[in-house]
Amino acid sequence: MEIISEDMLRHAIDVIGRTEGIQMDVDSLIDDLFILSNIYSTEQTFILAVNQIHHSLKQIEKTRTICTELFGNLSNWRSFHFQSRRVNKQSADLRIVYQDTGDFIQVRGFGNRHLPHDFYKRIYKR
């Protein structure tokens, strides 16, 4: 099994962390990318997933309300569903949970829907 390098993780932190109009807790960003690197464990699949997250964040920032409203303990948050790689008939395996503050998009977390465990249960604790 390939391991994602620290340099690649740092680059991913930089790319996602500097997305204009997006704010996210740094510790949560690092945690989410570390988990992502264990799921998409080859350089190619990791880069594809990070690029899709970055693209989706820009789309969310531009459009604001393009996704599902959450309920219960995550009410006032939204969930955006998308593919880790753009392939016909691939299910939307990635999620971004965010809130529009009016001034910026506050990201609570991102990751694979099911791996390594339920995404929503993981970010609920934040």
Predicted features and spans:
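Enriched for short, Lys/Arg-rich terminal
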Residues: 1-17, 21, 74-126
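Arg/Lys-rich, positively charged N-terminal/basic patches that mediate binding to nucleic acids
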Residues: 1-58
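Intrinsic disorder/low-structure terminal segments
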Residues: 45, 70, 79-81
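Short, contiguous, well-structured surface segments enriched in hydrophobic/aromatic residues
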Residues: 55-63, 71, 78
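Phosphate-/polyanion-interacting regions in eukaryotic proteins
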Residues: 67
